[in-house]
């Protein structure tokens, strides 16, 4: 019988993080001070987008990826929102299209010129209104082009078909603020976490809840699908107030498959999963560490590999898509770290050390490409398809020919699931909401006072009528 080691040998056990040199970082960026638990950063092979601090509305920078170094204070911004920008996401199939959502209750679609911005951009190619409160999350469908999901503080998820510029579905099964949305590989399933302490697995087209559990010993904040492994991972806090991760079977959420405590820090844990290498990265908000694990279908499921440490705390992290990585350097993942203490964006490359300079096929399998598998109409009809795969062997040289043509919209009511979402224009910020509330309170008080006066007048008239009826008898 041959001898076998008790530990599992992994080709990723020596992966290390390499921080970009100072001249390859992005300096002097006024990163937003908003405390919303998002990354405030989005990146693709062309552009880097960062939500910035601004007065009188929300804005974000869009910087060509090669334009590193110091960013001028008067650098052009995307600044059309009337409230703080809370989330931004690049279209995975059209690299010049970015979506943003804001406290002004809107979702907006922007088209960035190839060379970047030369002046402030204030006009979006499409403005989407449907939420009655601020919109905190947006996600693109992973395989269908121009399908966008938005989650608002009205506890609703709207599904937008950007080809027609309208919400086509509404998911209203949540009873509190939605914290996170994640899709499986083909986008046929969606997992959500919510402030009501529930983890849900949904069929996104119908909004039907397939699995649901209340996490009693594990307060969930973030969730991520493990590709086609039929597993979910959540990050959160244990009943002892320690940061914790839990692995779930997507078809049975009655109890977690396994749980693991991470540390006693208080910052949110952001999970990132690489479906090609089956590696999980855990990055803590407010600290500078990134832990990474290898995921397997059998026990122990999670194998700890190593930890990247940095003294500079991170506010959020953007992630470069696989086709934007440097395969010649054996780079398998790249973060863009928001360092508010330095007003800096710091690229961090995760590298597999190899002596050979040849293409390493074992760490670069076929990966999700930039071609959509489905049109919006096909997906809405119920078709499911996995992503269109591409090879990274020749590097990413493809010129994306896909373009987005915004629909011409007429003013009309927006009816989703039998509910008119635009029957009344919603307040766009929290201050407007408070003003509207106090105005309504004053109007209610005034109406009650008028009603009381009219009740008194009615009683007086009834008494006079009674006296008139009795007067002939007295005569």
UniProtKB/Swiss-Prot annotation:
Gene3D superfamilies: YVTN repeat-like/Quinoprotein amine dehydrogenase. Keywords: Actin-binding, Coiled coil, Cytoplasm, Cytoskeleton, Repeat, WD repeat. This is Coronin-2B. Pfam families: DUF1899 (PF08953), WD40 (PF00400), WD40_4 (PF16300). Residues 431-470 form a coiled coil. GO terms for molecular function: actin filament binding. It is found in: Cytoplasm, Cytoskeleton. WD repeats lie at residues 80-120, 130-172, 174-212, 215-258, 260-303. InterPro entries: Coronin, DUF1899, WD40/YVTN_repeat-like_dom_sf, WD40_repeat_CS, WD40_repeat_dom_sf, WD40_rpt. The gene is coro2b. PROSITE patterns: WD_REPEATS_1 (PS00678), WD_REPEATS_2 (PS50082), WD_REPEATS_REGION (PS50294). It comes from Xenopus laevis. Signal peptide: none annotated.
């Amino acid at each position: 019988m041959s001898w076998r080691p008790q530990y599992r040998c992994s080709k990723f056990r020596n992966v290390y993080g390499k921080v970009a040199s100072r001249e390859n970082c992005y300096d002097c960026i006024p990163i937003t001070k908003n405390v919303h638990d998002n990354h405030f950063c989005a990146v693709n092979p062309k552009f880097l987008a960062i939500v910035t601090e601004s007065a009188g509305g929300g804005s974000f920078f869009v910087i060509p990826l090669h334009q590193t170094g110091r960013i001028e204070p008067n650098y052009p911004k995307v600044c059309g929102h009337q409230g703080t920008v809370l989330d931004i996401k690049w279209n995975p199939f059209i690299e010049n299209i970015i979506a943003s959502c804001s406290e002004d209750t809107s979702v907006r679609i922007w088209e960035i010129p190839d060379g970047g911005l030369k002046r402030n951009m204030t006009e979006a190619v499409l403005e989407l209104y449907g939420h009655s409160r601020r919109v905190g999350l947006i996600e693109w469908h992973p395989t269908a082009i121009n399908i966008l999901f938005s989650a608002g503080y009205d506890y609703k998820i709207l599904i937008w078909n950007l080809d027609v510029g309208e919400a086509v579905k509404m998911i209203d099964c949540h009873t509190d603020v939605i914290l996170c949305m994640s899709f499986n590989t083909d986008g046929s399933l969606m997992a959500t976490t919510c402030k009501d302490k529930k983890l849900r697995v949904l069929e996104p087209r119908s909004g039907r809840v397939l699995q649901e559990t209340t996490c009693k010993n594990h307060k969930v904040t973030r969730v991520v699908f493990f590709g086609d492994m039929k597993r979910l991972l959540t990050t959160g806090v244990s009943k002892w107030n320690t940061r914790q991760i839990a692995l779930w079977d997507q078809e049975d959420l009655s109890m977690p498959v396994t749980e693991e405590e991470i540390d006693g820090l208080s910052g949110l844990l952001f999970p990132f999963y690489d479906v090609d290498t089956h590696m999980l990265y855990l990055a803590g908000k407010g600290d500078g560490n990134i832990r990474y694990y290898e995921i397997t279908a059998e026990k122990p499921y999670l194998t700890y590999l190593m930890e990247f440490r940095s003294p500079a705390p991170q506010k959020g992290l953007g992630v470069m898509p696989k086709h934007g990585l440097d395969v010649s350097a054996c780079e398998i993942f790249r973060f863009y770290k928001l360092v508010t203490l330095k007003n800096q964006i710091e690229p961090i490359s995760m590298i597999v050390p190899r002596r050979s300079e040849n293409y390493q096929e074992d760490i670069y399998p076929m990966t999700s490409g930039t071609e959509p598998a489905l049109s919006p109409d096909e997906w809405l009809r119920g078709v499911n398809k996995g992503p269109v795969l591409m090879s990274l062997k020749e590097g990413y040289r493809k010129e994306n020919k896909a373009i987005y043509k915004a629909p011409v919209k007429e003013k009309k009511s927006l009816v989703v699931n039998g509910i008119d979402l635009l029957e009344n224009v919603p307040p766009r910020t929290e201050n407007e909401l408070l003003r509207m509330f106090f105005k309504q309170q004053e109007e209610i008080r005034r109406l009650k006072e008028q009603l009381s006066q009219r009740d008194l007048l009615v009683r007086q008239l009834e008494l006079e009528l009674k006296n008139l009826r009795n007067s002939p008898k007295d005569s």
